A protein has these predicted regions:
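Structured mid-to-C-terminal alpha-helical surface segments
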Residues: 1-53, 65-70, 75, 81-343
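Short gly/ser-rich loop at a beta-strand->alpha-helix junction or flexible surface loop bordering the NTP-binding
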Residues: 53-60
Length: 343
């Protein structure tokens, strides 16, 4: 019978991670971190929370769809807006019909979501920690206390760019749809026998919606030129990877999905460009998408991408930053062309 990963001694864990690193080419500290990512998903989706949360973002692209070949440590989860604030939705419709309704919903989400995280998610993880015989601590973070951080006792360490923690970031201003159920396994599992690793079955947002989420985020950055934390260059890396797998082209042809993302972001994530003008998301998805920034904004992205490479967050033989930008420019042209043809 296989022994649980968390039942192994730290020495045995370290040895297994080193062996796996040699066999996979991935840094040992990231293989360890990946175990905790899957553990967190396993705890959440093995609980009553499973039907109310949608797993999305870059981690879903790597762990579920195998589109990107980079380590993604942040777990983005959408708690269905219809579950959190049903009393504020007109006819159950998730998009507000007025600015005043949006303000009421946003205010309620900022109050209720942290309460839900503390009252429901944290206890689920704490219970799973005990039953797994794992060692970690939890803390709430974020401006609106919408993040739950799992600080684990690391066996292996890297350069420090990737810390020994997992960030669960929750949002509750969308439905998380469209989505479907998928299995998720630890990267180390296929190369280490005789050990039982965490396994999860999350409800996952479709990759095409993730494309539009990332494309509109890149569009906003290109107009603003303001870097939002470390690893922000991951969005452009992911977009370029989605072009190779055909997901970008498929998303570009889904005009209804593009408009849905634009409508949602226009209401809940209004932004202003560098000149103070309101960012027009609808223009972005109807022929005016801009994915490649210029000047200092481009240089900041390149520095961030270099840091990702240095800590091994990306697998070997990755494209250069210039190649990624070239691919994103091609995506931009294709998306805009299809959008204009589809009008």
């Amino acid at each position: 019978m296989s022994e649980s990963w968390f039942a192994l001694s730290r020495a045995d864990q370290a040895e297994a991670l080193e062996v796996a690193a040699g066999r996979t080419g991935r840094p040992a500290h990231l293989l360890e971190k990946d175990i905790w990512v899957v553990w967190a998903l396993s705890a959440i989706y093995g609980s009553p929370l499973a039907e109310k949360l949608t797993f999305k973002g870059g981690t879903s692209l790597s762990k579920v769809y195998k589109i990107i070949d980079r380590f993604s440590e942040d777990v983005d989860l959408t708690y269905d807006i219809r579950e959190l604030v049903p009393d504020l939705l007109q006819g159950g419709h998730p998009i507000p019909v007025s600015a005043s309704q949006e303000k009421k919903i946003t205010s309620a989400v900022r109050t209720r979501l942290p309460e839900w995280i503390a009252g429901w998610v944290k206890p689920v993880l704490e219970g799973s920690l005990v039953s797994s015989n794992a060692q970690a601590e939890f803390r709430v973070d974020g401006k609106d206390r919408e993040k739950l951080i799992i600080d684990y006792r690391a066996v292996k360490t890297g350069t420090g760019y990737a810390e020994a923690s997992i960030q669960l970031e929750f949002g509750a201003r969308a439905t998380g749809e469209p989505n479907s159920r998928h299995m998720v396994h630890c990267d180390i599992a296929p190369v280490i026998e005789g050990v039982k690793f965490p396994v999860a079955a999350p409800l996952v947002m479709v990759a095409e919606r993730t494309f539009w989420e990332k494309a509109t985020a890149a569009h906003v950055y290109s107009l603003q030129g303001r870097l939002r934390g470390e690893r922000y260059s991951r969005h452009w890396y992911d977009l370029a990877a989605m072009a190779k797998t055909g997901h970008a082209a498929q998303a570009a042809g889904d005009h209804q999905l593009a408009r849905a993302v634009a409508e949602h972001k226009s209401v809940f994530f209004a932004e202003k460009d560098a000149n103070g003008s309101k960012v027009n998301y609808h223009k972005a998805v109807t022929g005016g998408l801009q994915l490649v920034p210029a000047g200092a904004a481009l240089a900041a992205l390149e520095s961030d991408y270099t840091a990702m490479l240095e800590d091994g967050l990306l697998a070997l033989h990755q494209p250069s930053f210039a190649e990624i930008m070239e691919k994103c420019l091609a995506i931009q042209d294709e998306v805009n062309h299809k959008a204009r043809d589809g009008q």
